[in-house]
Amino acid sequence: RLEKIYRIGKKNEVEGLEKISLDQLAEIEPHCKGVGALWVPCTGIIDFRSATEKMVEVAQGVQGKSNVHLGEEVLDFATDGDGTVVITNKGKYKADKLIVCGGLQADRLARKDGVKLRERVVGFRGDYYELNDHAKHKVKNLIYPVPNPDFPFLGVHFTRMTNGEIECGPNAVFTFKREGYGKTDFNLRDTLDALGYSGTWKLFFSNMSFGINEYRRAFSKRLFLKTLQRLVPSLTIDDIRPGRSG
């Protein structure tokens, strides 16, 4: 699988991509252990909040009448001449063109706009831990495992954030609320939507053991740590603390 990822990276001309020896791995990440590794020096992350704020600034610079409306629920769409009217709980907005980036509500918004969909959004939550200050020296870059191609997840990994914090995770567990970021969050409509969809049960039954293990890890710091130790064996229970969910 590592070799396949390497070939794909080369085909896509990923800058600086190379296969490295275990000695090179030890130089780059002294606390990381593995049987093989790829080094991608051009990889990085961004602060999504800052990036979004800059996009708003640019949009308003290009079109002075541009506005951002927060905290509004889209109730419906309507056609008005050649344009579309977005109806919210606080007003109506008309546009010549409408682009819907609905996130976890994308399927519901599409249906409101008359799109016939068989698919449904099924929510999954990812929990993270963070490294405590005394352990941050154990991770110097971004460290990822070789992903399992059977699942649309990257696997538990280490991310050095723009603010200097280091996130570890996530897991992947079914959530009973689409925007439920707490372990016990629940929404009846979201739950019935998900459990009333045959695709949800197909996913459950074909990945039962994986799902059970993910849930166990969601409620056990020690089990989460064991997964992290596959990449950084020297981590201890005192090195990590609960972080955000997403």
Set out the residue ranges of the language-model regions:
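Extended, charge-rich helix/loop segments that form flexible
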Residues: 177-211
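Dinucleotide-binding Rossmann-like beta1-alpha1 core, especially the glycine-rich loop
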Residues: 1-28, 34, 155-156, 165, ...
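Flavin-dependent oxidoreductases
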Residues: 77-187
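General beta-strand structural signal in soluble alpha/beta enzymes
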Residues: 18-21, 68-70, 100, 168, ...
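Flavin (FAD/FMN) cofactor-binding core of flavoprotein oxidoreductases
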Residues: 18-27, 120-124, 134, 202-246
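A general structural signal for well-ordered alpha-helical segments in protein cores
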Residues: 2-5, 22, 52, 106, ...
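Helical element adjacent to the flavin cofactor pocket in flavoenzyme catalytic cores
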Residues: 38-97, 108
